[in-house]
Amino acid sequence: MILTALRGALGFLTRIPVGRDEAAWAAFARSPWTFPVVGYLVGGLVALSLFVPAPAPTVALAFVLAVYAVTGIGHLDGVADIGDAAAVHGDREERRRVLKDSALGVGGTVALALVVLGLATAALGLVEVAATAGDGGPLPPVIGIVVAAEVGAKAATATLVCVGDAPHEGLGSALTGESSPGATLSVFALAAPAALLTWPQVLPGLAALLVALATAALVARWSRRRLGGVSGDVLGATTELARVAALHAGVIAWTRF
């Protein structure tokens, strides 16, 4: 059951070729704790791109490419849809209609640009951390920050899965309908150790985790008021927004405190 759930999580949350089948999906849908576990693996893989021997802008590009090579670009569709919905001056029904529209509007374009730009600038900050940080801890600081941010982003998404209600049938309801608020305990328990990955400095890892969760809270509040609940697009957008926010928080905490 555990391995099947993890395989389902890897198949859904990444592009790692583990195969997809109904049993794995069903096990994953009932196991939100798999989100942060996958975050540890994804964070470790994409962090390796920061050690490319190249100028900082090239390393930043490599990092962005690595993120989407490992996780895919499916969540960016959620960013675009939520961006378009946020730009609508109308009621919930109008915003939901926009979510189902495959055309990309101005709001979605701006949202996508900001997320990718945010990811690239965070990578530049990580390059600076790598160049100036010492080797006092068990892991290079940039690896700790990236993994903590990815675990935080996945835990943030899992939290919405556990506490959210979908406004309509779809991916959101397929996940939220299988979990309960009590499942957040296992999510938080598995995500918490990521705060120690920047040891001996705990603040950068802790900041990344907490800011990711705070991002989820803000997205959840907005989606409930504007959309009536947590849809699949909201979950995808939460992952992307929380990752960017968490990376910047980790870099700021390392360089300024």
Curated annotation (Swiss-Prot):
Q: Which residues cross the membrane?
A: 28-48, 50-70, 110-130, 199-219
Pfam entry (one) = CobS
Topological relation to the membrane, as annotated: Multi-pass membrane protein
Q: Which reaction is the catalytic activity of this chain?
A: alpha-ribazole + adenosylcob(III)inamide-GDP = adenosylcob(III)alamin + GMP + H(+); alpha-ribazole 5'-phosphate + adenosylcob(III)inamide-GDP = adenosylcob(III)alamin 5'-phosphate + GMP + H(+)
Any one annotated GO CC term: plasma membrane
Q: Which cofactor does it need?
A: Mg(2+)
The main location is membrane
Where, per UniProt, does this protein localize?
A: Cell membrane
Pathway info: Cofactor biosynthesis; adenosylcobalamin biosynthesis; adenosylcobalamin from cob(II)yrinate a,c-diamide: step 7/7
List GO molecular-function terms, semicolon-separated: adenosylcobinamide-GDP ribazoletransferase activity; cobalamin 5'-phosphate synthase activity
Q: What is its EC number?
A: 2.7.8.26
Q: Which UniProt keywords apply?
A: Cell membrane, Cobalamin biosynthesis, Magnesium, Membrane, Transferase, Transmembrane, Transmembrane helix
| EC category name | transferase
**One GO BP annotation of this record:** cobalamin biosynthetic process
| InterPro entries in the record | CobS
What is the role of the protein in this entry? Joins adenosylcobinamide-GDP and alpha-ribazole to generate adenosylcobalamin (Ado-cobalamin). Also synthesizes adenosylcobalamin 5'-phosphate from adenosylcobinamide-GDP and alpha-ribazole 5'-phosphate.
HAMAP family, per database record: CobS
Give the family, as the similarity comment puts it: Belongs to the CobS family.
What name does this protein carry?
Adenosylcobinamide-GDP ribazoletransferase
**Naturally occurring in which organism (per UniProt):** Halorubrum lacusprofundi (strain ATCC 49239 / DSM 5036 / JCM 8891 / ACAM 34)
